[in-house]
Amino acid sequence: DDLATAAADLSTSGTVHHHIADMGVKGEPAGFVEWAADQMGGVDIVVSNVSAMAGPDWEMSCAVDLIGMDALVRASLEKMDDHAGCNVICIGSRAASVAAPRIAAYAGVKAATVSAMKTLSREVARRGIRANVVSPGDIIFEGGVWGRAKEENGKLWEMIVKENPFRRLGTPEEVADVVAFIASERSSFVTGANILVDGGATSGLQI
């Protein structure tokens, strides 16, 4: 119901299709791609934003964030024509570039995502296809961990805001703008990159 409501809200600015698939279940990522290709007449761009957010559960994190992501991407590549407009974008995380306690599984699979896309970018370049990662930092949105912290844990919220050079957190729209740029022909010579959208939070680190 929530997905249908969101799709209806978004449809005011264009055509929106919605579909439910479990990226951790074998066959479902490919099935989703088949459905999407049928609905839209093919696949030119795929954005993989899947994440189990499974805490310390390595098995679940790998099943969704790595194996599910790879299945989604590989199925999409089979539907892509060989031309410069096609590209793959995976949503990574600043966590792949920094050390933080209690997120080893999440950070590990996001680091693996960056490495996988660098490799993929070399595999598909001759087809004219690009592959990149967009890695958000701390992003605030309704229902998210930082949205809850702002409401319920003032000390944690103040600390996380002070850690960012801009003294604020990012928004989903700021991440989406970067994804839209990477998906467009304006970034036609960008591939194999990991673009951080973190307000400079990692700028003082050697990575």
Regions found by a protein language model. Give the residues of each.
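Residue(s) in the substrate-gating loop at a strand-loop-helix junction
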Residues: S93
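Short, small/polar-rich loop/turn modules that mediate ligand/substrate recognition or access, typified
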Residues: A125, R130, V190-G192
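Short C-terminal tail/terminal secondary-structure segment
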Residues: A180, T191-I207
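Alpha-helical segment proximal to the catalytic Tyr-Lys
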Residues: E78, R122-E123, S188
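Substrate-binding pocket helix/loop in short-chain dehydrogenase/reductase
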Residues: D57-C62, I160
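A glycine/serine/threonine-rich, flexible loop-to-helix segment
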Residues: R126, P136-E163, G204-I207
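Active-site helix of classical SDR
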Residues: V73, V109, M117
